[in-house]
Amino acid sequence: MPPFFDFLMSAGIAFFVFIISAIILPGFFIWIGLKVVGKERDVLRCGMANFAAVVITAVVAFILHFTPLVLLLPLLAFLIYLYVLKTLLDVGFIEAFAATIIAGVVIFLLAVILLLIFGVWLLFTPPPAQMMHVKF
């Protein structure tokens, strides 16, 4: 057996983790935003459109980083992101904006709920036992 025999298996696991973390989860939140707006799109299509929009925006922002548009670059990058997202998802500009805002609110509320759950869990978890006769 070669030493890197299960390289494909480990690359497969890394690939699936990448797909889930970079495409499926953001696509799910964009899908929720589009569902609230009233548009029907697949989660995978939303995820791929979001991933492509982020990559294109990063490339354009990298190029514009060398210009004196430092103060306007975040707004310009967000507008480029919205334009690419609306083009790939076949929705209007306002609908793409609303979907991203709704997705951001959903992510924020999910983070608050998880923080509350883990905060209560940490509040009522007993502290670890003290190590006796140990000096640091």
From Swiss-Prot:
Protein name: Uncharacterized protein AF_1013
Compartments (UniProt record): Cell membrane
Record keywords, A-Z: Cell membrane, Membrane, Transmembrane, Transmembrane helix
Membrane topology: Multi-pass membrane protein
Membrane-crossing segments per the record: 10-32, 44-66, 70-89, 102-124
Main location as per UniProt: membrane
Cellular component terms per the entry's GO annotation: plasma membrane
Organism, as annotated: Archaeoglobus fulgidus (strain ATCC 49558 / DSM 4304 / JCM 9628 / NBRC 100126 / VC-16)
Superkingdom to which the source organism belongs: Archaea
